[in-house]
């Protein structure tokens, strides 16, 4: 049942953040299995939570859920926010048993399991559904670390290159793969890139030709303040697509006219102090995005330098890799991720393959960082 709740929960991705995606199944347990009474998911920010939605469906169908079991991907909340406490709703509905996959780490909402037990409800935390645990991972990660969940995306050739030695990369992946990227852009809170990608490609970095649930914030890591004022990213701000440019503090004085012009055009320009070695600290930017702009999920679409820096800071939660049926065989071509040399394979980072999908002759691989 938790696997089903997880599938239902994913319907809310891109519509509920910064809240968690949550799914709920209410059913009656019998010797021969489970009779499903209702399912529900958190469908939009500010809307009914998954448990309340499932109970609403029961009411709409004239079903009394008393004595039933509720399977929920995340521990029911125990606070009054935009919606009343889910724990109280389950108690009032006389639910007999609640099974949840992950405890709620939010200090504002914790305590649901305890409240249910005090009311006589049997409560079990279950780790049997990896899908249910993963469904709320971005939310739990942000609450526990103060960082958004980061997905690094790139397209590469069979031999692992993202561009030729001359810098050409259009297009490695096919049309179907690129359309899937636009669908993903429509579901994340932010899209992060580096100034090198902007100068080379002048990208727009918006979701196009797909249903839009939100306009993702475009974020450019630009320590030296080189973003062209006439680039597509800046021009599109007036159309409602937000833009943040992350710079070093010295830029604000050295490029005062540039800074003022960007502010006048509605661009966020935020300065971050470098580390002791003068390097831009990407984690500081990500924490600011999570805290000040409520970014829960961010997708990185950049060149190897920024990806390598984020990898070395341990900031990549998932890798979304498109492999195209193209072989370059170019020793000077650009690899997907930069970084410092590693002497042995044993010292390399390991990721777990979560999902694989084919788009024509392209293959999309989704990897997750191991604990």
Where are these regions (language model features)?
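Short beta-strand scaffold segments in enzyme catalytic cores
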Residues: 21-32, 154-155, 365
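Active-site ligand-binding patch in enzyme domains
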Residues: 141, 151-154, 158, 162-294, ...
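Conserved histidine-centered catalytic loops in small-molecule metabolism enzymes
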Residues: 339-371
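Zn2+-dependent cytidine deaminase-like catalytic core
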Residues: 26-131, 217, 244, 249-251, ...
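Short gly/pro/ser/thr-enriched loop/turn and capping motifs at secondary-structure boundaries
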Residues: 105-108, 199, 226-228, 252-253, ...
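Short, basic/aromatic recognition patches
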Residues: 1-17, 142
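Flexible, gly/pro- and Lys/Arg-enriched active-site loops
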Residues: 312-351
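Residue-level signal for inorganic ion chemistry
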Residues: 5, 23, 77, 116, ...
């Amino acid at each position: 049942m938790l696997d089903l709740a997880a599938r239902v929960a994913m319907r809310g991705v891109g519509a509920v953040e910064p809240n968690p995606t949550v799914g709920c199944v209410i059913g009656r347990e019998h010797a021969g299995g489970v009779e499903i009474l209702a399912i529900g998911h958190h469908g939009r920010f500010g809307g009914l939570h998954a448990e309340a939605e499932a109970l609403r469906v029961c009411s709409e169908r004239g079903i009394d859920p008393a004595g039933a079991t509720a399977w929920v991907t995340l521990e029911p909340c125990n606070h009054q926010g935009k919606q009343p406490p889910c724990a109280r709703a389950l108690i009032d509905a006389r639910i007999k048993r609640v099974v949840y996959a992950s405890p709620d780490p939010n200090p504002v909402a914790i305590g649901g399991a305890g409240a249910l037990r005090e009311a006589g409800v049997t409560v079990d935390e279950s780790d049997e559904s990896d899908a249910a645990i993963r469904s709320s991972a971005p939310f739990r990660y942000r609450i526990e670390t103060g960082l958004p969940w980061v997905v690094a995306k790139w397209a590469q050739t069979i031999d692992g290159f993202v561009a030729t030695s001359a810098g050409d990369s259009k297009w490695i992946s096919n049309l179907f793969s690129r359309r899937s990227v636009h669908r993903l852009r429509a579901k994340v809170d932010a899209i992060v890139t580096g100034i090198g990608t902007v100068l080379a490609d002048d990208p727009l970095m918006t979701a196009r030709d797909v249903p839009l649930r939100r306009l993702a914030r475009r974020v450019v890591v630009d320590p030296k303040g080189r973003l062209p004022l006439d680039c597509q990213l800046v021009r599109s701000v007036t159309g409602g697509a937000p833009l943040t440019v992350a710079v070093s503090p010295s830029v604000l004085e050295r490029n005062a006219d540039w800074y003022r012009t960007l502010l006048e055009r509605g661009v966020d320009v935020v300065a971050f102090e470098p580390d002791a070695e003068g390097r831009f600290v990407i984690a500081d930017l990500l924490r600011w995005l999570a805290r000040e702009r409520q970014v829960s999920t961010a997708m990185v679409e950049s060149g190897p330098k920024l990806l390598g820096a984020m990898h070395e800071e341990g900031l990549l939660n998932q890798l979304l890799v498109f492999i195209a049926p193209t072989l370059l065989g170019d020793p000077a071509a650009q690899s997907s991720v930069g970084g410092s040399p590693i002497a042995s394979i044993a010292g390399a980072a390991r990721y777990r393959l979560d999902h694989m999908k084919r788009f024509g002759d392209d293959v999309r691989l989704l990897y997750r960082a191991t604990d």
